[in-house]
Amino acid sequence: MSLNVKQSRIAILFSSCLISISFFSQANTKGIDEIKNLETDFNGRIGVYALDTGSGKSFSYRANERFPLCSSFKGFLAAAVLKGSQDNRLNLNQIVNYNTRSLEFHSPITTKYKDNGMSLGDMAAAALQYSDNGATNIILERYIGGPEGMTKFMRSIGDEDFRLDRWELDLNTAIPGDERDTSTPAAVAKSLKTLALGNILSEHEKETYQTWLKGNTTGAARIRASVPSDWVVGDKTGSCGAYGTANDYAVVWPKNRAPLIISVYTTKNEKEAKHEDKVIAEASRIAIDNLK
């Protein structure tokens, strides 16, 4: 091969790479602009992190900024219970008894079964799928070691950003600038990937965790609303009830494609502001479009 031919082929290859890089850069910039416009209309902050686990392509916006967790930590609480079962420290079939004084506002499942108690496994599922506050605080207190124990569990899986400082319902203040009970969209997404798709949980516990996520009842208007109806979604939402603060994170299983990990967090500066599910759904749609 002559030197000129070789140089020409190298030049063509280099040009092709530049074109590809330019294409993806333009697509990503377009997505960022869309999120910025959405954020302006929302009049608050939006944090997004999305990952295609097949291609490795990601999309992010304010992904390393802190946002209030609200109830979204309960998805990781359920995983901590499964890890405890896997390590033979906890028994999912153990019946947990309690009285109504143990139950906070919004405890629909634990209230229903207050007379006979619930299994620990069912209680963990209730915390995730129904955001049951009674189940959450009972599990935190008796089996996890409180907020400090929950934070310690997240450190054990490599998450250095998550912090839980308070119990339900106190953790829902969502005061701007308050780092208590916060994490970042990127850290949340990566921890979800680790727990739902990684090797921290055994195949049996991981299958249970995915089933619990898929059975969540609180997210129909958020990430689930941003994807085609034949895609499977497993998610956990959070809503603080103050400063328009709400969030959602999910594993999304598209048809004929590797799973996606999506994390969307939103908050405002006005205490009485209402959260907006449609903003979470739209931010998720934009992120997913930019993973193609």
UniProtKB/Swiss-Prot annotation:
UniProt keyword Ribonucleoprotein present: no
Database matches in InterPro entries: Beta-lactam/transpept-like, Beta-lactam_cat, Beta-lactam_class-A
Keywords: Antibiotic resistance, Disulfide bond, Hydrolase, Signal
Ion transport listed as a keyword: no
Chain sites annotated for binding substrate: K236, T237, G238
Top-level taxon of origin: Bacteria
Record's catalysed reaction(s): a beta-lactam + H2O = a substituted beta-amino acid
Signal sequence region: 1-27
UniProt GO BP: beta-lactam antibiotic catabolic process; response to antibiotic
Catalytic-site annotation from UniProt: S71 (acyl-ester intermediate)
Single GO term (MF): beta-lactamase activity
EC number from the UniProt entry: 3.5.2.6
SS bonds (residue pairs): C70-C240
Top EC class of this enzyme: hydrolase
Other facts noted in the record for this chain: The class A beta-lactamase family has a specific amino-acid numbering system, sometimes called Ambler or ABL numbering and often misspelt as Amber. A multiple sequence alignment was used to derive a consensus sequence and then the consensus was numbered taking into account insertions and deletions. This allows use of identical numbers, e.g. for active site residues, despite differences in protein length. UniProt always uses natural numbering of residues, hence there appear to be differences in numbering between this entry and some papers.
Family, similarity comment: Belongs to the class-A beta-lactamase family.
Function in brief: Hydrolyzes carbapenems such as imipenem, which are extended-spectrum beta-lactam antibiotics.
Name this protein carries in UniProt: Imipenem-hydrolyzing beta-lactamase
Organism: Enterobacter cloacae
Gene this chain is encoded by: nmcA
